[in-house]
From Swiss-Prot:
Gene, per the UniProt record: obg
PANTHER family in UniProt: DEVELOPMENTALLY REGULATED GTP-BINDING PROTEIN-RELATED (PTHR11702), MITOCHONDRIAL RIBOSOME-ASSOCIATED GTPASE 2 (PTHR11702:SF31)
Cofactor: Mg(2+)
Identification of the protein by name: GTPase Obg
InterPro entries: G_OBG (IPR031167), GTP-bd (IPR006073), GTP-bd_Obg/CgtA (IPR014100), GTP-bd_prot_GTP1/OBG_C_sf (IPR036346), GTP1-OBG_CS (IPR006074), GTP1_OBG_dom (IPR006169), GTP1_OBG_dom_sf (IPR036726), OBG_GTPase (IPR045086)
The family this protein is said to belong to: Belongs to the TRAFAC class OBG-HflX-like GTPase superfamily. OBG GTPase family.
GO terms for biological process, alphabetical: ribosome biogenesis
Region (Disordered): 118-145
Subcellular location: Cytoplasm
OBG-type G domain segment(s): 159-329
Record GO terms (molecular function): GTP binding; GTPase activity; magnesium ion binding
NCBIfam families: Obg_CgtA, Obg_CgtA_exten, PRK12296.1, PRK12297.1, PRK12299.1
Superkingdom of the organism of origin: Bacteria
């Protein structure tokens, strides 16, 4: 089964909690704080495995949760960092944020990695908060929660050759006779609804990967007939083999088929118009094909080579394979994938600058309570142990230093009013 698109949920590991502890050795006077930091939570990492060809592994498991960091220990011992959760994907996988549709990573090369959900840092033990004014702090920090997000995985085939054309022109039949692939073949449209890959060897021992892509129809570039799902696989092929039913047995004119498919390719991605293309005139064993081929060549001109074949009698198949191998040899040093990525401004792995997170916003709930939100304050809230009075006092000091108290006063907050941060409620005290 070929799976080329799937949505999954990721949860990176939370950081381990720091602890509150003190030195109690017999001969160490004024032992002081000895609480260790928590370990780092595991990140969710995607890695390319060239042995994979589909996203089938993600079809049956859609939720992935990485491990939590180990809590800190006494004697200033740091908790163990959790090992990253590594998910293997095939070459050509694009990872997008479902909520924003932002491309997070474009993984092409074997062994290439991308951290998509970052693990939380470990909370600090009470040793970290010791100061001359407070040499024995009796509070510590909870671990930072790991990132959580939904992503979509899209696989663009990394085939050398892509077979394109209208439904029922013989693409699957060709792939089945030149490789060991066993695509579904039937006398009806859209027998192929998922791409099929096959390794092809020519009589002179050259080889390449060929993809049989589902049939295109007019309007495919606008998404008609699942066109977007099919066309995205063409983008990474080096050579397009454009197959045409020269017999006109489906009631279509061969020249119109040729024009429509090329228009759809260009409309979807302008660069596909300049991609090396080999035109294959199939079904030459049928009576009308010879006359149609003459008219077809007159219409498109001598600049476009046409190779007549019959996938039923297998006439001229070897000549077609030689032509494909020659064309691949001619363009072997051209990397169409890189050009496309640069043209749309996509980095293979997205590394973003994280701006200052000190900004916050204040709003009002229907019951009149003040709601404070912002990355920094919410992060501090999650890492504060509210069962510890000293930790609560530290949280209050942090709010003051960020200017939240002054901002609440400016919004009209008075003594005794309710202030909410995430799921917590506080009473504003002057």
């Amino acid at each position: 089964m070929f799976v080329d698109q799937v949505k999954i949920s990721l949860k990176a590991g939370d950081g381990g909690n720091g602890i509150t502890a003190y030195r109690r050795e017999k001969y160490v006077p004024f032992g002081g704080p000895a609480g260790g930091d928590g370990g780092k939570g595991a990140s969710v990492v995607f890695e390319v495995d060239e042995g994979l060809r589909t996203l089938l592994d993600f079809r049956y498991q859609r939720h992935f949760k990485a491990s939590k960091g180990e809590n800190g220990q006494s004697s200033n011992m740091h908790g163990k960092n959790a090992e990253d959760l590594v998910l293997k994907v095939p070459p050509g996988t694009i990872i997008k944020n479902v909520e924003t549709d932002e491309v997070l990573a474009d993984l092409v090369e074997d062994g290439q990695r991308a951290v998509v959900a970052k693990g939380g840092r470990g909370g600090r033990g009470n040793s970290r908060f010791a100061t001359p004014r407070n040499p024995a702090p009796d509070f510590s920090e909870k671990g930072e929660p790991g990132e959580e997000l939904d992503v979509s995985l899209e696989l663009k085939l990394l085939a050398d050759v892509g077979l394109v054309g209208f439904p029922s022109v013989g693409k699957s039949t060709l792939l089945s006779i030149v490789s060991k692939a066993k695509p579904k073949i039937g006398a009806y449209h859209f027998t192929t609804i998922k791409p099929n890959l096959g390794v092809v060897s020519t009589p002179d021992q050259r080889s390449f990967v060929m993809a049989d892509l589902p049939g295109l129809i007019e309007g495919a570039s606008d998404g008609v007939g699942l066109g977007h799902q099919f066309l995205r696989h063409v983008e990474r092929t080096k050579v397009i083999v454009h197959m045409i039913d020269m017999s006109g047995s489906e009631g279509r004119e061969p020249i119109e088929d040729y024009k429509v498919i090329n228009q759809e390719l260009a409309a979807y991605e302008q660069r596909l118009e300049d991609r090396p293309q080999i035109v294959v005139a199939n079904k030459m064993d049928l009576p009308e094909s010879q006359d149609n081929l003459i008219l077809f060549k007159e219409e498109i001109g001598e600049d476009v080579p046409v190779i007549p074949v019959s996938t039923i009698t297998r006439d001229n198949i070897d000549q077609l394979l030689y032509a494909i191998a020659d064309k691949l040899e001619e363009y072997k040093d051209v990397d169409f994938t890189v050009e496309e990525e640069e043209s749309v401004g996509i980095n293979r792995v997205l590394y973003k600058h994280t701006p200052s997170q000190d900004k916050f916003t204040i709003s009002r709930d229907d019951d009149g309570a003040y709601v404070v939100s912002g990355n920094a304050i919410e992060r501090m809230f999650k890492m504060t142990d509210f069962n510890s009075d000293p930790a609560v006092r530290r949280f209050a000091r942090q709010m003051r230093s960020m200017g939240i108290d002054d901002a609440l006063r400016e919004r009209g907050c008075k003594n005794g009013d309710i202030v909410r941060i995430l799921g917590g409620e506080f009473e504003f005290v002057e």
